[in-house]
Amino acid sequence: MKRAFKGGAPKERTVRVMTGGAIESIQRPVIIRKTPVVWGIPCDEIMYSKFFQYFIKHANYMPWDGWCFTEDTYLPKARNFIHNAFLLESTMPYLLMMDSDIVFPPDLVDRLMAHNLPIVGGWYKDKKKDSHPPVVFDFVPGDDDYLHVVPRQKGSGLERVEAMGAGNWLMTRAVAEALGESPYSLNRGGEDLEICWKLKQLGIPLHVDWDIALAHVGVGVY
């Protein structure tokens, strides 16, 4: 690090990514993030090219960050593997859960960390429903043992919510410890809803930043 920046850190860096058969060159400011994060990527059956294009352009990945992904595509198992690896085999302060079908804007980690919250994420649309509502919810009563939710309307700024998709959220080590090992489960519905319900029972606030718009590949970008 000292050798590389002996003459002072560069102000900008050039990122080159091939998109649509052409090389795209982008000038990005150099931002040194001192706080490490584990990037947890639960892989889908396929890895989307757009994910890697935007990761190279926007991630601002630091040499001291961690990286964890799985070959298993069964989502609860994959998320639990990443969660447990962060909890038991890492000492880093943050885990970023980032699905392989999520495309994200620049400086995502820095923007989420700046909130200094236990767990916070950007938002994206539901690509399975025709109306594509935000994957952000309120819990509602049901007549069985499953977790029932209704989608929220898109808001603005930072908002505390009851539930949201796990495709992009940043949690602190304290939250991971409070949830314990292997907290993801499909027993009562979506594995991310199970986490959100546990957070609610633990009194841990969950927030969405509506200003961080993500793309759910299959819906469209932003």
Predicted regions and their residues:
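Conserved catalytic core of nucleotide-sugar-dependent glycosyltransferases
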Residues: H83, P105-L186
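Active-site nucleotide-sugar/metal-binding loop of Leloir-type enzymes
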Residues: N80-Y94
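Short, high-confidence coil segments that cap the C-terminus of an alpha-helix
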Residues: T91-M92, L117, I204
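Short beta-strand-to-loop acidic/aromatic patch adjacent to the donor-nucleotide binding site
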Residues: T91-V103
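Catalytic donor-sugar/metal-binding loop of nucleotide-sugar-dependent glycosyltransferases
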Residues: S185-N187, L193-H216, G220-Y222
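N-proximal low-complexity "stem/linker" segments adjacent to membrane-targeting elements
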Residues: K2-T73, K77
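Anion (oxyanion) recognition and catalysis
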Residues: N60-Y61, M113, K200
